[in-house]
């Protein structure tokens, strides 16, 4: 048997880790994908890129539905809230989704709603993995509000409630002993310390997969620390009960490099997408696979159509989104996203599809149509700069990331601003376009584009904020379970 595990931290195949395990059964005709084996291909495969160390993978799971969640009570750091029967079922479903994923260590908040979730997740495994209960995963300390319902809190402390909703990083509360403190500031210190300790035990140069089970606020803070603490990031994220977020960490030129593989996936639950609020929603999809994706060729603005697997991915996305009410649809004017959008819309007859050049892929100029090995022959230093500091690179006769950022974000804002609050729009575009849009929404910068994974056929959901003074919410990012497995198994090719 031949098994291939491939990880990529960017669009390029130079940053790919390849692991081959051989047995005496001979070599099957298999094609390699992002984290496993799929499809038929020839026996011989070449890798025109250096092999690098496996990254550290973090599986971040929020606890299942609790008694206080149902009652809409503030839980914070108290341990009065218990896991409900629904929460127990959610934990088991999470465990089943992760059953085939090797996990080297598990850490959990000691609060019973999280500890019970961890027990449920691990109960379906056969490896006897025991969790470590770590105070570094305790939930945010909201002592003065503990046990209050959301309505009671708004009545008793309207000023504090407004600050919590609009500027949570600035919230100050008073403990029973009279001391003043800032809950989010304290929690960020806690998150930094937890991650520092975790990475000392599980270095990014290793190959560990670590399960971390915690609470809404502490997990948000962990994510913000991983992303470099973008300004106003706390309200840009959504984490549902029993959701899974996957982060890959690898050695970088400055410390470690982070990649969001997926965020707030509840595809193992029903319904498979977070509930829509009262404002507009946008469903962002990357186009299906092309032959050039598979080969690792830089496509850019060369109009390569979907291959057979790309059409199958579009069909899988159609099935995954079938129950979603779509009111409008937008696509890049290029063939591969347009074909993907048309495939998804087969379940949404009558929904008009608008194509726009604003969502076109980055122009790679003279790099288009070339493999990385070919690009390296003529632009070795520029290609390395593209990997290390993409915001500094002017593509030869092509675009910069800033160029793509400006036109894609402007196009996105035009689409979002044109939606009625009740509407949901489908938007299908490309890797670089989606990355720049999502970096913008997460409060990141053009230099951070490698932090966002966008698999072929992957689904991302963005919700417009209830409060117009607040940023849009990334409700989930790069869902690919409809393409097979809880981890992203899409091709690790170039743009």
Task: Please identify what each model-predicted range represents.
Residues 15, 29-31, 41-44:
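Intrinsically disordered, low-complexity segments enriched in serine/threonine/proline/glycine
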Residues 36-41, 46-57, 143-152, 206-208, ...:
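Acidic, low-complexity terminal tails and accessory targeting/binding regions
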Residues 63, 87, 215, 287, ...:
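Short, conserved phosphate/pyrophosphate- and ester-handling motifs at nucleotide-, phospho-/glycolipid
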Residues 65-116, 120-121, 177-191, 291-344, ...:
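Loop-to-helix element that buttresses phosphate recognition and phosphoryl-transfer chemistry
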């Amino acid at each position: 048997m031949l098994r291939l595990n491939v990880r990529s931290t960017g669009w390029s195949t130079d940053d790919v880790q390849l692991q081959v395990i051989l047995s005496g059964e001979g070599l099957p005709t298999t094609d390699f994908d992002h984290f496993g084996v799929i499809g038929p291909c020839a026996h011989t495969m070449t890798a025109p890129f250096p092999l690098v160390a496996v990254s550290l993978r973090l599986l971040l799971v929020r606890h299942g539905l609790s008694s206080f969640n149902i009652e809409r009570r503030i839980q914070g750091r108290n341990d009065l809230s218990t896991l409900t029967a629904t929460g127990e079922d959610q934990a088991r479903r999470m465990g089943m989704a992760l059953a085939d994923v090797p996990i080297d260590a598990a850490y959990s908040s000691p609060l019973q709603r999280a500890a019970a979730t961890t027990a449920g997740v691990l109960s379906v495994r056969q490896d006897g993995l025991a969790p470590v209960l770590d105070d570094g995963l305790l939930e945010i300390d909201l002592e003065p509000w503990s046990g209050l319902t959301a309505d009671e809190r708004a009545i008793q402390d309207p000023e504090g409630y407004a600050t919590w909703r609009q500027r949570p990083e600035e919230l100050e509360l008073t403990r029973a002993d009279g001391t003043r403190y800032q809950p989010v500031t304290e929690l960020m210190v806690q998150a930094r310390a937890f991650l520092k300790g975790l990475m000392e035990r599980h270095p990014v140069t290793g190959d560990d997969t670590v399960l971390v089970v915690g609470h809404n606020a502490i997990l948000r803070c962990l994510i913000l620390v991983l992303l470099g603490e973008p300004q106003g990031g706390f309200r840009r994220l959504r984490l549902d009960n029993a959701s899974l977020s996957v982060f890959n960490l690898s050695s970088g030129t400055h410390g470690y490099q982070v990649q969001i593989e997926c965020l707030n996936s509840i595809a193992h639950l029903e319904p498979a997408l977070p509930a829509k609020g009262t404002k507009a929603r946008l469903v962002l999809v990357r186009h299906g696979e092309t032959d050039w994706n598979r080969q690792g060729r830089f496509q850019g603005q060369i109009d390569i159509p979907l291959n057979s697997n790309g059409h199958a991915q579009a069909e899988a996305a159609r099935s995954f989104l079938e129950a979603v009410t779509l009111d409008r649809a937008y696509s890049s004017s290029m063939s591969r996203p347009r074909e993907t959008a048309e495939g998804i819309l087969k379940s949404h007859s009558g929904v008009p599809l608008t194509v726009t050049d604003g969502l076109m892929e980055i122009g790679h100029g003279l790099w288009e149509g070339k493999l990385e090995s070919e690009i390296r022959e003529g632009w070795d230093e520029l290609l390395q700069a593209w990997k290390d500091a993409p915001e500094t690179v002017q593509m030869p006769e092509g675009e910069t990331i800033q160029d793509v950022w400006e036109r894609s974000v402007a196009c996105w804002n035009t689409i979002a601003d044109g939606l009625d609050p009740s509407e949901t729009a489908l938007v299908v575009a490309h890797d670089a376009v989606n990355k720049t849009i999502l970096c913008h929404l997460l409060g990141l910068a053009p230099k951070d584009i490698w932090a966002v994974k966008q698999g072929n056929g992957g689904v991302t959901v963005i919700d417009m904020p209830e409060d117009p003074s607040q940023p849009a919410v990334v409700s989930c990012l790069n869902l690919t379970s409809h393409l097979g497995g809880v981890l992203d198994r899409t091709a690790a090719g170039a743009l």
